[in-house]
Structures are given as structure tokens and as C-alpha cells.
Amino acid sequence: MKKIILISGKAENGKTTLANILKEKLESYGNKVVITRYALYLKEIAKKYCAWDGNKDKDGRELLQKLGTDVIRQKLNKPLFHVGRICEDIEITQDYYDYVIIDDVRYENEVYYPIAMFGKDKVYTVRVTRYNELNGEKVCFTNSLTDEQKKHISETSLDTFSFDYYCTNLTDNFGIIDFDANNIISELDGEA
């Protein structure tokens, strides 16, 4: 494995869009790429035990926030549950791909745990911020979360974190995020 790419950002800001673009571009250079999510097991638990239908509507997001943070991280005091499981998966399978992209990074330990496990040279962090264009000016994108969901720690805990790269996602202009994806790949190549 060459690198783990960790992508963070607010809900609906383009984390998965960037992950898919990076995957496509890296694969075009002959790399094997896997996209996964820290919430992989959380979503399976929500579907199997909580009758979640897989939709990230108001109720679905509320369930995931409560189950993932309020129950697992806080009530059960298992802050490493999500990151630990995915890092174990990566450790087991790391000889089968070049890059793994995790596109739902929400907490500092979801950055520091893989750094401790695999080394700083193997982890690259990206923050995606989405904007709308209004009269030629960039204005912050407003997602569909409720005010309470927007204030949830899973949406705010990395607001002041220092990332390796900051990506702009301009609504209706995928050229910008594509440009940033090329810059990220150039930086990754420069580190190799």
C-alpha cells in the first residue's frame, strides 16, 4: 500500500465525489484503489438492528449520529470502534491495493489512529468545502441537515484541524474539484 487518503468535510460537501474522482484518476495510472468508510460497520448495524432503510434523510442522519456518536463513542466509551475496525481491515488487506480512500473522516482520532498504525508518511489528509456561486462570488453551501444536526460534534469536530490539502467544490462546476484532484495526485507522486 502506498497511501491512505483521508477525506473530511461537512455533509453534502463532496467527500464521496472527490473520492470517486481520485479513484478514477489513480486507477488510470495503473493503481489499485479501494474506497471505504469509517461508518461501514455503523451502517450495517443500523440496517440490521435498527431497521434503517439506508436513506440519509433527516431521520436516517439522526439515527446514524445518535448511534455512532452518542451511543458507541460516548455511552459505551468506544471512541476507536469505527477507526479501529477499518484500520484492522486495511492492515489485513494492504498488500492487495495501492491506495485506500476513506471519505467520511469526522474526528481527530480518525486521523491520528491510522498515522500511529501505518506511519505519517502513509497518511494524507484532505478537507473538502463546497461553495455556491452567487453573482460571481463564492458563498458557503447550505446542506439539508437540520440546525441540530449541523451542530452535532460529528459535523464540527474537525473545523479547525490542519489538513494536508484543502479542496474546493464549487457547486455545478466539477472542473474545480477535478483540478484539486489532479493537485492531490501530484502531491502524492511527489511524496512517493
For the regions a language model picked out, list residue spans one by one.
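Conserved lysine of the Walker
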Residues: 15
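Post-Walker A helix-loop "phosphate-sensing" segment adjacent to the P-loop in P-loop NTPases
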Residues: 24-34
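P-loop (Walker A) phosphate-binding loop of NTP-binding proteins
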Residues: 9-10
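ATP-dependent NMP and nucleoside kinases share a basic, alpha-helical "lid"
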Residues: 86-145
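Small-molecule kinase domains that catalyze NTP-dependent phosphoryl transfer to phosphate-bearing small molecules
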Residues: 124-192
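Hydrophobic positions on the alpha1 helix immediately C-terminal to the Walker A/P-loop
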Residues: 18
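ATP-dependent small-molecule kinase phosphotransfer cores
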Residues: 37-100
